[in-house]
């Protein structure tokens, strides 16, 4: 009986919560009304669609990407759709100073922050890895390091609002995929960093959620051009994908899976990992790090 109380019941609780709790939460668009949200990589594709969804929900939206002309159009459309306010800051996430300063600027523009959606990537064409260390370094800097810089800069504001960090990742960050070695490495690294960070937040009483979004092939122009004639799979609609990302972040889910195949979440969700993390965390004395 003691063994059951100490081990089996917590395991069962984790398993049930992992599979059912988040799915049973009800999302309502009004949850985003008046919320202050940053979306990176928002000049096109999934990022642009997220900005439009947030605008329809009445959020304050701050978007960033490299193309100022594209961002101007996104902001104009957001205002037409009903955004409480919409702003843009153009720049490249290859520049870590810009990444840090962008968060501060965004906070000034909308008076704080409730949600940070990290969506930008460094484009890497499909191909066999040919020892291009420069490409690998640049991919890791944009796809990983800038995410760390942005989330670190945003944390003080997110702590004030019990906010959320939403990290857009990929199936290529959960399973091995050919022709995308550098990209895949950056996405696996996102899982490792932000999943560990989530555990630290929970253990040290930081009420900021982290949602990792694992996406399959999405029908963005960039993705469709990249995989043409190489990868044979059904692409999912970017509009619906964008909405699912927003829902998952708003409901503070640990992970969101979005793919054309219903098997993807069934096969990739890993209750064994959650159980291991639960018991591993108990081996640490985290009290000394609370409020530090």
UniProtKB/Swiss-Prot annotation:
<dbReference type="Pfam" id="PF00106">
    <property type="entry name" value="adh_short"/>
</dbReference>
<keyword id="KW-1133">Transmembrane helix</keyword>
<keyword id="KW-0472">Membrane</keyword>
<dbReference type="InterPro" id="IPR036291">
    <property type="entry name" value="NAD(P)-bd_dom_sf"/>
</dbReference>
<dbReference type="GO" id="GO:0005496">
    <property type="term" value="F:steroid binding"/>
</dbReference>
<feature type="transmembrane region" description="Helical">
    <location>
        <begin position="7"/>
        <end position="24"/>
    </location>
</feature>
<comment type="function">
    <text>Controls the reversible conversion of biologically active glucocorticoids such as cortisone to cortisol, and 11-dehydrocorticosterone to corticosterone in the presence of NADP(H). Participates in the corticosteroid receptor-mediated anti-inflammatory response, as well as metabolic and homeostatic processes. Plays a role in the secretion of aqueous humor in the eye, maintaining a normotensive, intraocular environment. Bidirectional in vitro, predominantly functions as a reductase in vivo, thereby increasing the concentration of active glucocorticoids.</text>
</comment>
<keyword id="KW-0812">Transmembrane</keyword>
<dbReference type="GO" id="GO:0070524">
    <property type="term" value="F:11-beta-hydroxysteroid dehydrogenase (NADP+) activity"/>
</dbReference>
<protein>
    <recommendedName>
        <fullName>11-beta-hydroxysteroid dehydrogenase 1</fullName>
        <ecNumber>1.1.1.146</ecNumber>
        <ecNumber>1.1.1.201</ecNumber>
    </recommendedName>
</protein>
<dbReference type="GO" id="GO:0005789">
    <property type="term" value="C:endoplasmic reticulum membrane"/>
</dbReference>
<comment type="similarity">
    <text>Belongs to the short-chain dehydrogenases/reductases (SDR) family.</text>
</comment>
<dbReference type="GO" id="GO:0043231">
    <property type="term" value="C:intracellular membrane-bounded organelle"/>
</dbReference>
<keyword id="KW-0560">Oxidoreductase</keyword>
<dbReference type="InterPro" id="IPR002347">
    <property type="entry name" value="SDR_fam"/>
</dbReference>
<dbReference type="GO" id="GO:0006706">
    <property type="term" value="P:steroid catabolic process"/>
</dbReference>
<comment type="subunit">
    <text>Homodimer.</text>
</comment>
<dbReference type="InterPro" id="IPR020904">
    <property type="entry name" value="Sc_DH/Rdtase_CS"/>
</dbReference>
<dbReference type="InterPro" id="IPR051253">
    <property type="entry name" value="11-beta-HSD"/>
</dbReference>
<keyword id="KW-0256">Endoplasmic reticulum</keyword>
């Amino acid at each position: 009986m003691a063994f059951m109380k100490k081990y089996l019941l917590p395991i069962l609780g984790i398993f049930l919560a992992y599979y059912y709790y988040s799915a049973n939460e009800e999302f309502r668009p009004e949850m985003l009304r008046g919320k202050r949200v940053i979306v990176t990589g928002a000049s096109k594709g999934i990022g642009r669609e997220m900005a439009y969804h947030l605008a329809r929900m009445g959020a304050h939206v701050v978007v960033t990407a490299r193309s100022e002309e594209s961002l101007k159009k996104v902001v104009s459309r957001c205002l037409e759709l009903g955004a409480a306010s919409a702003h843009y800051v153009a720049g490249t996430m290859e520049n870590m100073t810009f990444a840090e300063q962008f968060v501060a600027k965004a906070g000034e523009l909308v008076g704080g922050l409730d949600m940070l959606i990290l969506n930008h990537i460094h484009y890497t064409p499909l191909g066999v890895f040919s020892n291009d260390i420069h490409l690998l370094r640049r991919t890791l800097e944009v796809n990983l390091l800038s995410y760390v810089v942005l989330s670190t800069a945003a944390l003080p504001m997110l702590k004030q609002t019990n906010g959320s960090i939403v990290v857009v990742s990929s199936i290529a960050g959960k399973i091995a995929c050919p022709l995308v070695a550098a990209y895949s490495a950056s996405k696996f690294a996102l899982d490792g960093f932000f999943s560990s960070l989530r555990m630290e937040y929970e253990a040290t009483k930081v009420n900021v959620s982290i949602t990792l979004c694992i996406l399959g092939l999405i029908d963005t122009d960039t993705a469709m051009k990249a995989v043409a004639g190489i990868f044979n799979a059904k692409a999912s609609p970017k509009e619906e994908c964008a909405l699912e990302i927003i829902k998952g972040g708003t409901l503070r889910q640990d992970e969101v899976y979005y793919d054309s195949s219903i098997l993807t979440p069934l096969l990739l969700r890993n209750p064994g990992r959650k159980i291991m993390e639960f018991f591993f965390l108990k081996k640490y004395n985290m009290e000394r790090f609370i409020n530090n």
